[in-house]
Regions:
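N-terminal glycine-/serine-/threonine-rich phosphate-binding loop
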Residues: 2-4, 8-13, 17-39
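Active-site phosphate-binding/coordination module
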Residues: 24-126
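Alpha-helical scaffold elements within enzyme catalytic domains, especially in hydrolases
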Residues: 35, 99-100, 170-173, 244, ...
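Short, structured coil segments at secondary-structure junctions
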Residues: 61-63, 71, 79, 175-177, ...
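Conserved acidic, metal-coordinating active-site core of Asp-based
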Residues: 104-219, 223-228, 240
Length: 274
């Protein structure tokens, strides 16, 4: 395997991994990615962001590999400008989500389609803020009946940490056959169709690219990255990741502010590629 970058697939999370905590791309990461790709390596992103949001960061890297969006719900081929895989929440799942939402008055709901973020009612501060930060296409739906159907790549619940834990437990105990869910912060719970996760997305992409599983690597920083880290042969996390994330990783890189992706690329080159 030595000196053959073309046999390798490296996948990175965006927030708190590729980018630093101020949501900027460290120059050391960009340089390392460029070197890795120029030598024949395959690099891409896997994020909970929707396609429009992911594209902002993808386009800075000069890569062409299909990317994984909405936590594995979709894969987009930028070279062909087409979605090559999309697995949204089912119609029955949509009804369950809306039923949960209706029972908790302080709960906020954001629905993520491939290119549009739908904000359920005027109280959706979380969805509004993330839409404004990256100037993303969004639509305010004053009534849940106004939410489109069949395009729910993922939904995000926002509330107090106590309420979010309650919703997480509810979904895992009563609706486990319909959804997978994971915390992206103490206040946000993301919900996707059953079987959808970053790991499944990476595995699907690996098969599409016909890359051996033993030459797959990924780096992340939080609990929504666990499936991805468990799927690849060489998992890494950023230095600021929770301790239980570090325990499942082969390599713990530096803090994301200092260029964790570059650190991991250097590790892979030193130990496996060069």
């Amino acid at each position: 395997m030595k000196n053959d970058y073309s046999k390798w697939l490296l996948v990175s999370d965006i927030d708190g991994t590729l980018n630093d905590k101020s949501m900027k791309l460290p120059s050391v990461n960009k340089s390392a990615i460029e070197r890795y790709v120029e030598n024949g390596g395959t690099f891409t992103l896997c994020s909970g962001r929707n396609l429009q949001s992911l594209s902002i960061h993808y386009n800075k890297l000069g890569i062409k590999t299909p990317a994984i969006f909405l936590n594995g719900a979709g894969i987009y081929d930028f070279d062909k400008s087409e979605t090559i895989y999309f697995n949204p929440i089912t119609s029955e799942g949509e009804k369950i989500i809306l039923d949960i939402f209706s029972k908790y008055k302080t709960l906020q709901l954001t629905v993520f389609g491939t290119d549009i973020i739908y904000l359920a009612t005027r109280t959706c501060i979380y969805g509004y803020v993330i839409s404004k930060l990256d100037k993303l296409n969004h639509k305010l739906c004053k009534k849940t009946d106004d939410l489109p159907r069949g395009v729910w790549g993922k939904v995000s619940f926002f509330g107090t940490s106590r309420l979010i834990r309650k919703i997480q437990n509810l979904i895992k105990t009563q609706y486990n056959n319909y959804f997978d869910c994971f915390l992206t912060s103490p206040f946000t719970l993301e919900v996707v169709n059953k079987g959808v996760n970053k790991g499944a997305g990476v595995e699907k992409l690996r098969c599409i690219l016909d890359i051996s599983s033993e030459n797959t690597a990924a780096i992340g920083d939080y609990y929504n990255d666990i499936d991805m880290l468990k799927t690849v042969s060489h998992p890494a996390c950023c230095g600021q990741a929770p301790d239980d994330i570090k325990e499942i990783c082969e390599y713990v890189a530096c803090h994301c502010n200092n260029g964790a992706v570059a650190d991991f690329i250097n590790y892979l080159e030193k130990n496996y590629i060069l």
